[in-house]
């Protein structure tokens, strides 16, 4: 899952708990701004937070409350779509590419048919990580993350399975990766598998303009992600309506950065 702060592309060996200066990295024709405003995304309705970050966490998953496919405004996953991102690894210099492909496959987890998204990270053509992520959307419009099957590679060769988990296995519940109606200040659990994954997300508000190689976005939704396993790390992400994630960069911990280059078809 590209939203993992405790599993950012190349696993972080050690994270300094201090803020690092944001770096402007040449990405073909793109760069970006970082003007997070206080304005909030327009909402037509509000629902109770299904993945609260405080207190016991044991969400009730009713398969009847889930729909087929994922068409959330800020995180749509239409089968057949390919999103290509380019950027740099945690050292701020090593080039990396990330290709997300929304497959036509589903995986049944806890009775819910989750959309399978294949995420492949590489550097100079050599594979680094391959992950199958599982997403599903409830009838309220929230996008849930049901886990991942991740593999790591070194020098182009398979090394090991990495931080894989599945909702319902070993007590791990699913989490939220995008709310139906995100509001500034909202916080939610993305992953809750103690000892393996403890990611949280928080809505910062609207941001813009954001310029990436794919295009310029006048308005985006800005979030920040942190992890209980990496207390000194934080990553900002920017989402565009109808497209999804367009820019992400680590703002505490290292210099990793990725920006959207293309979307097809």
Where are these regions (language model features)?
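Core hydrophobic alpha-helical transmembrane segments of single-pass membrane proteins
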Residues: 15-23
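Conserved functional acidic sites
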Residues: 44-265
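Bacterial N-terminal signal peptides that target proteins for export
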Residues: 3-16
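Bacterial lipoprotein signal-peptidase II cleavage site
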Residues: 29-39
């Amino acid at each position: 899952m590209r939203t993992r702060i405790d599993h950012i592309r190349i696993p972080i060996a050690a994270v300094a708990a201090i803020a690092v200066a944001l770096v402007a990295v040449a990405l073909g024709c793109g760069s970006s701004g970082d003007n997070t405003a206080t304005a909030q995304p327009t909402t037509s309705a509000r629902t109770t937070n299904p993945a609260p970050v405080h207190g016991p966490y044991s969400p009730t998953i009713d398969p009847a409350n889930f729909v087929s496919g994922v068409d959330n405004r800020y995180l749509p996953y239409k089968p057949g779509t390919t999103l290509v991102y380019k950027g740099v690894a945690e050292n701020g210099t090593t080039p990396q590419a990330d290709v997300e492909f929304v497959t036509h496959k589903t995986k049944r987890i806890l009775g819910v048919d989750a959309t399978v998204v294949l995420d492949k990270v590489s550097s100079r053509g050599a594979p680094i990580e391959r992950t199958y992520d599982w997403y599903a959307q409830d009838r309220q419009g929230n996008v849930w993350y049901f886990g991942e099957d991740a593999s790591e590679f070194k020098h182009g060769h398979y090394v090991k399975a990495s931080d894989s988990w599945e909702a319902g296995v070993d007590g791990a519940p699913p989490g939220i990766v995008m709310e139906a109606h995100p509001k500034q200040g909202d916080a939610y659990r993305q992953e809750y598998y103690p000892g393996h994954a403890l990611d949280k997300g928080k809505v910062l508000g609207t941001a813009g303009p954001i310029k990436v190689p794919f295009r310029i976005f006048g308005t985006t939704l800005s979030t920040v992600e942190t992890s209980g396993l990496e207390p000194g790390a934080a990553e900002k992400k920017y989402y565009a309506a109808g497209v999804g994630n367009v820019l992400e960069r680590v703002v505490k911990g290292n210099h990793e950065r990725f920006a959207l280059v293309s979307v097809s078809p």
